[in-house]
Curated annotation (Swiss-Prot):
Annotated source species: Homo sapiens
Impact noted for substituting residue 113 to C: In HFM; loss-of-function mutation; targeted to the plasma membrane but has significantly impaired folate transport activity
Residues that hold pemetrexed according to the record: 90, 185, 315
Disease link: Hereditary folate malabsorption: Rare autosomal recessive disorder characterized by impaired intestinal folate absorption with folate deficiency resulting in anemia, hypoimmunoglobulinemia with recurrent infections, and recurrent or chronic diarrhea. In many patients, neurological abnormalities such as seizures or intellectual disability become apparent during early childhood, attributed to impaired transport of folates into the central nervous system. When diagnosed early, the disorder can be treated by administration of folate.
InterPro entries the record matches: MFS, MFS_dom, MFS_trans_sf, Sugar_transporter_CS
Alphabetized UniProt keyword annotations: Acetylation, Cell membrane, Cytoplasm, Disease variant, Disulfide bond, Endosome, Folate-binding, Glycoprotein, Membrane, Phosphoprotein, Symport, Transmembrane, Transmembrane helix, Transport
Membrane-spanning intervals of the chain: 26-44, 83-108, 113-135, 141-154, 178-203, 209-227, 267-289, 303-325, 332-351, 356-376, 389-414, 423-441
Catalyzed chemical reaction(s): folate(in) + H(+)(in) = folate(out) + H(+)(out); (6S)-5-methyl-5,6,7,8-tetrahydrofolate(in) + H(+)(in) = (6S)-5-methyl-5,6,7,8-tetrahydrofolate(out) + H(+)(out); methotrexate(in) + H(+)(in) = methotrexate(out) + H(+)(out); pemetrexed(in) + H(+)(in) = pemetrexed(out) + H(+)(out)
Lineage: Eukaryota, Metazoa, Chordata, Craniata, Vertebrata
Protein name: Proton-coupled folate transporter
Biological process according to GO: folate import across plasma membrane; folate transmembrane transport; folic acid metabolic process; folic acid transport; heme metabolic process; intestinal folate absorption; intracellular iron ion homeostasis; proton transmembrane transport
Binding site for H(+): 156, 185, 281
Domain of life per record: Eukaryota
Gene Ontology cellular component annotations, sorted alphabetically: apical plasma membrane; basolateral plasma membrane; brush border membrane; cell surface; cytoplasm; endosome; endosome membrane; plasma membrane
Modified residues (Phosphoserine): 6, 458
């Protein structure tokens, strides 16, 4: 009976014929995040120094005079401009990515994961190319916004993550899914840690241009890997139209269409939980470099590199902790522990005035990144196998909305609180993290095994 149905579909599975080898998705995510993390803090520092030069602020990182410039209005103007242009880049990326990532993610449920991975890789490549031109030719910083928009148009990093997590869901069982999600996120963290260590030292030695050129080269390699080496995980990819409202409708139906195999309440509340977690994560990340550059810390590029590496270390420590804690605790309670440490780290950041205290805050985040793989796995188990792309494109949309919200709140709040408490945004982040802590605990207590109903083989 199945034999008569399969032959018509096999000729449509054309992408497999073009593959040189069936590689996993993790190298793609590793290369993408290495390039992005290499560019991120450097872009912030580049904006800082460009605005400093434009406004005639000498802004050196000399330790002796740093604390005496805390009330310098020119320095505060540099901080404000840097923060605002970071916001403009994120808003531009969100407005375009809101449409493209949801469209492309649901489209991947039909055509396969590789087309989205290739498009998203090309977008990241274009963004890096624009950044190289800005740095090399001293173009207006507004071109950073243009590069961000071009990247978002082709799916952005969120689209690449949507396809990557969907491909993991395609090939993993419900028993192993949480750990596989954490493993994918760990590859993000290792890449970020290495890029952070390299970026700070390289900037001090050779300036801004060479790190951006390396990011461009890595993204070229990533695009080639996505096109010719990634092993398609969708069983029967088939041709379908890209520009149709059916793709967006499939995402809406995840949350509004009643079905016996899923709980719309759980989908909505877990989506809210991951929205808040990502908002705090990216909001803090957006202002951390600026917080460290300015008084009283006055970090140089080397220390910023160490700090950014410490920020990515929890991807590894969280992976190991998740594997160990799963032997004695349910996933939800592991996430609760991670949230508790995340809150502690944010509170320490808020009151950090010396370098050792900042690194203490980073140390407290060692379990903070068990949260998102747990929530992603729970969401994945609530939908059918044929809805994984739509689900993770919805999560990518939530991710984009969270990043915009983070930029709007943290990048606007940070300059507004410079005069009375620079660390206030971190306290706000700690308070916001109480929301997912309550939601996850409430859902686990109310119906702890609901997510396994699609996967009876799991305990």
């Amino acid at each position: 009976m199945e034999g008569s149905a399969s032959p018509p579909e096999k000729p449509r599975a054309r992408p497999a014929a073009a593959v040189l080898c069936r590689g996993p998705v993790e190298p793609l995510v590793f290369l993408a995040n290495f390039a992005l993390v290499l560019q991120g803090p450097l872009t912030t520092q580049y904006l800082w120094h460009r605005f400093s030069a434009d406004l005639g602020y000498n802004g050196t990182r000399q330790r002796g005079g740093c604390s005496n410039r805390s009330a310098d209005p020119t320095m505060q103007e540099v901080e404000t401009l840097t923060s605002h242009w970071t916001l403009y880049m994120n808003v531009g990326g969100f407005l375009v990515g809101l449409f493209s990532s949801t469209l492309l993610g649901a489209w991947s449920d039909s055509v396969g994961r590789r087309p989205l991975l290739v498009l998203a890789s090309l977008g990241l490549l274009l963004q890096a190319l624009v950044s190289v031109f800005v740095v090399q030719l001293q173009l207006h910083v507004g071109y950073f916004v243009l590069g961000r928009i071009l990247c978002a148009l082709l799916g952005d990093f969120g689209g690449l993550l949507a396809a990557s997590f969907a491909s993991v869901a395609d090939v993993s069982s419900s028993r192993s899914r949480t750990f596989r999600m954490a493993l994918l996120e760990a590859s993000i963290g290792v890449a970020g840690m290495l890029a952070s260590l390299l970026g700070g030292h390289w900037l001090r030695a050779q300036g801004y241009a060479n790190p951006f050129w390396l990011a461009l080269a890595l993204l070229i390699a990533m695009t080639l890997y996505a096109a010719f080496c990634f092993g398609e995980t969708l069983k029967e990819p088939k041709s379908t139209r890209l520009f149709t409202f059916r793709h967006h409708r499939s995402i809406v139906q995840l949350y509004v269409a009643p079905a016996p195999e899923k709980s719309r309440k759980h989908l909505a509340l877990y989506s809210l939980a991951i929205f808040v977690v990502i908002t705090v994560h990216f909001g803090a990340q957006d202002i951390l470099t600026l917080y460290e550059l300015s008084t009283p810390l006055c970090w140089d590029s080397k220390l910023i590199g160490y700090g950014s590496a410490a920020q990515h270390l929890p991807y590894l420590t969280s992976l190991l902790a998740l594997k160990l804690l799963q032997y004695c605790l349910a996933d939800a309670w592991v996430a609760e522990i991670g949230l508790a440490f995340n809150i502690l780290g944010m509170v320490v950041f808020a009151f950090a005035t010396i370098t050792p205290l900042m690194f203490t805050g980073y140390g407290l985040l060692f379990l903070s990144l068990v949260i998102t793989p747990v929530i992603r796995a729970k969401l994945s188990k609530l939908v059918r196998e044929t809805e994984q792309g739509a689900l993770f494109s919805a999560v990518a949309c939530v991710n984009s909305l969270a990043m915009l919200t983070a930029s709007g709140i943290f990048n606007s709040l940070y300059p507004a609180t410079l005069n009375f408490m620079k660390g206030f945004p971190f306290l706000l982040g700690a308070g916001l993290l109480l929301i997912p802590a309550v939601l996850i605990g409430m859902l686990e207590k109310a119906d702890p095994h609901l997510e396994f109903q699609q996967f009876p083989q799991s305990p």
